[in-house]
């Protein structure tokens, strides 16, 4: 999906004596033109021809992410001016009731619906909003972006001992902040959880609900969560690490001004969207903000990846329980539960050879991947060991924890050991 821009710069004019009278006469006319027309390097955007494609950006921001909302919507407005499809936004923020609106190619808002206070972290709310967006803005194709906090596949009540003593703290207090699917501090009359758990999300969404789902949240590049979502979209996009949330530094989730134009095409466009995402962060002037990971996953290949992983790990749960995780590529920082390790690195460490089938399937599954060498100066990422996906190691010391039970009782991926 391409877009056009027209750029005006300075014109170097050569005057000759015979043309002086003309230019003097024209000068008075030129001075009447708006000053903006004489600015250097002014960009006039020529919008692409519209296509029948809607992307819903679902912003569960009734939490500390409220501070990032204005920046994100501004970015979406900029991106819409270069986009062929239609961006629809649902936003639930602190101190306001939720609303649904579309963004025009001129960057304006068109109100679609207003809501009473509700729990945007309830997956049934998400499913309803998707249905309403499709009804109010009908189109041939549909994409979905989930925007909020996240702890990956972990359930809301994960045990505190997953974060070692001495490293615990509120990540929001530090710099840069990150987006720890969807927390809602004011759920209205909804008595359901204020956290959207991945198995409940998968149950609530119909199969083939979108062509792609982009998780603009932390830690959702985990194989456990993506496998649960394998039937919901053709492609899944996520980060195995945290995602920055520093709007003041132009470093907050997806840079929609650059990425949105690519979210209305096919897989090649999605790959270009990921390239733009990575390039945005990799070019940051501050090293601490040069922090991003991204993976584009072909959901149709996830079943094959389950089989290939099971072929090498079946019956090896005991080996996993005793695994020395200190040698693995990790994707968690100090304040994040220490359970996010590189999937490929785990398999290669445990199996020690005989991984050709697994490696080939992993390459088919992860269409595109990229990672900066460092993440917020706390985490080194080896390009050699970066597979694009994280995976849980069910260590014996986690037995008895609620997330250990949740993993084996609720997540289908745990079947790789059976």
Predicted ranges, named:
Residues 92-111, 146-188:
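Surface-exposed loop and adjacent secondary-structure segments within mature catalytic domains
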Residues 48, 169-418:
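Terminal, contiguous helix-loop blocks that mediate binding/assembly
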Residues 62-65, 148-154, 218-222:
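Gly/Ser/Thr-rich loops at beta-strand to alpha-helix junctions
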Residues 54-59, 86-91, 143-146, 211-215, ...:
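Structural recognition of the beta-strand scaffold that forms the well-ordered cores
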Residues 1-36:
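Sec-dependent bacterial lipoprotein signal peptides
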Residues 17, 22, 32-54, 395:
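Bacterial Sec-dependent N-terminal signal peptides
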């Amino acid at each position: 999906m391409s877009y056009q821009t027209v750029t005006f710069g300075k014109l170097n004019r050569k005057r000759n004596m015979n043309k002086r009278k003309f230019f003097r006469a024209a000068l008075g006319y030129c001075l009447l033109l708006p000053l903006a027309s004489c600015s250097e390097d002014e960009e006039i955007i020529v919008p692409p021809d519209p296509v029948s494609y809607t992307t819903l950006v679902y912003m569960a921001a009734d939490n500390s992410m409220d501070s990032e909302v204005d920046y994100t919507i501004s970015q979406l407005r900029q991106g819409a001016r270069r986009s062929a499809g239609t961006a629809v936004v649902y936003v639930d923020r602190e101190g306001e009731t939720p609303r649904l609106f579309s963004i025009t190619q001129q960057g304006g808002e068109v109100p679609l619906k207003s809501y009473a206070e509700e729990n945007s972290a309830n997956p049934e709310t998400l499913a309803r909003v998707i249905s309403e967006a499709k009804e109010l803005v009908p189109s041939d194709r549909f994409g979905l972006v989930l925007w909020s906090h996240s702890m990956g596949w972990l359930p809301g009540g994960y045990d505190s001992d997953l974060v070692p003593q001495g490293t615990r703290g509120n990540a929001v207090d530090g710099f840069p902040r990150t987006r720890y699917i969807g927390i809602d501090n004011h759920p209205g009359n909804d008595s359901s959880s204020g956290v959207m758990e991945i198995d409940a999300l998968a149950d609530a969404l119909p199969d083939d609900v979108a062509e792609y789902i982009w998780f603009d949240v932390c830690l959702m590049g985990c194989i456990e969560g993506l496998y649960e979502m394998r039937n919901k979209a053709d492609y899944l996009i996520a980060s195995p690490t945290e995602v920055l949330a520093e709007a003041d530094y132009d470093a907050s989730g997806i840079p929609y001004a650059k990425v949105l134009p690519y979210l209305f095409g096919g897989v090649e466009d999605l790959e270009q969207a990921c390239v733009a995402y990575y390039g945005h962060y990799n070019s940051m002037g501050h090293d601490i903000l040069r922090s991003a990971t991204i993976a584009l996953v072909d959901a149709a290949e996830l079943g094959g990846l389950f089989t290939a992983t099971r072929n090498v790990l079946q019956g090896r749960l005991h080996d996993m329980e005793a695994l020395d995780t200190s040698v693995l590529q990790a994707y968690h920082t100090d304040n994040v539960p220490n359970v996010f390790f590189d999937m490929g690195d785990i398999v290669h460490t445990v199996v020690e050879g005989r991984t050709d089938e697994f490696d080939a399937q992993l390459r088919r599954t992860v269409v595109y991947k990229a990672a900066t060498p460092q993440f917020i100066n706390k985490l080194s990422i080896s390009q050699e060991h970066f597979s694009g996906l994280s995976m849980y190691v069910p260590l014996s010391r986690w037995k008895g924890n609620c997330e250990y039970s949740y993993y084996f009782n609720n997540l289908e991926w745990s079947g790789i050991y059976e």
